[in-house]
A protein has these predicted regions:
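Glycine-rich, highly charged phosphate/nucleotide-binding loops
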Residues: 1-7, 58-74, 80-89
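Short acidic, glycine/proline-enriched helix-loop-strand junctions
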Residues: 74, 111-135
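Structural motif
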Residues: 77-78, 102
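ADP-ribose/adenylate-binding Rossmann-like module
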Residues: 95-118
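A charged, well-structured terminal subsegment
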Residues: 134-147
Length: 147
């Protein structure tokens, strides 16, 4: 797949099919982009599950934070990665192992080798994009209204 440009249809399908999103690198600090994105996704009707070993066991925006994707006790539709590109590969591999249908790497996060591994396993991949930007750009309704 060409990861330079994604069709609106591809992004729309991902963002309307996913209901449970694990946020790798979620932060309890309000000023952090991962915290703001998680709050936005919750407001839009997604179940956002924080994953951060430094905050494991804590509550972030009303959700228990897990140390790893393997610790999340429910199915994950999409994994949203807030890690530097150099650290994205292990998160992608963990997403594959967890059975996620989609791996989404945030703005300025790109790992082509990890993307290829995911796609070889049938996992959809988005890199260098933010759902909190794409949802309003695509004019997607909140999940509860869309279903």
């Amino acid at each position: 797949m060409n990861h330079e440009n994604y069709s609106d249809a591809y992004l729309r399908a991902i963002l309307t099919d996913a209901m449970t999103i694990a946020i790798v690198g979620a932060s309890p600090r309000r000023e952090r982009p991962s915290h703001r994105a998680m709050a936005y996704l919750q407001r839009r009707g997604y179940r956002a599950i924080p994953v951060n070993p430094n905050a494991a066991g804590d509550t972030i925006l009303g959700e228990t934070c897990y140390a790893s994707l393997a610790d999340v006790p429910e199915p994950i539709d999409m994994v949203d990665i807030f890690r530097r590109s150099q650290l994205a590969g292990p998160a992608v591999d963990a997403a594959i192992a967890a059975g996620a249908k989609v791996v989404w790497m945030q703005l300025d996060v790109r790992d082509d080798a990890a993307a290829a591994r995911a796609e070889a396993r049938g996992v959809k991949v988005v890199m260098n994009r933010c759902p909190a930007i794409e949802i309003p750009r695509l004019r997607l309704p909140p999940l509860s209204a869309a279903r």
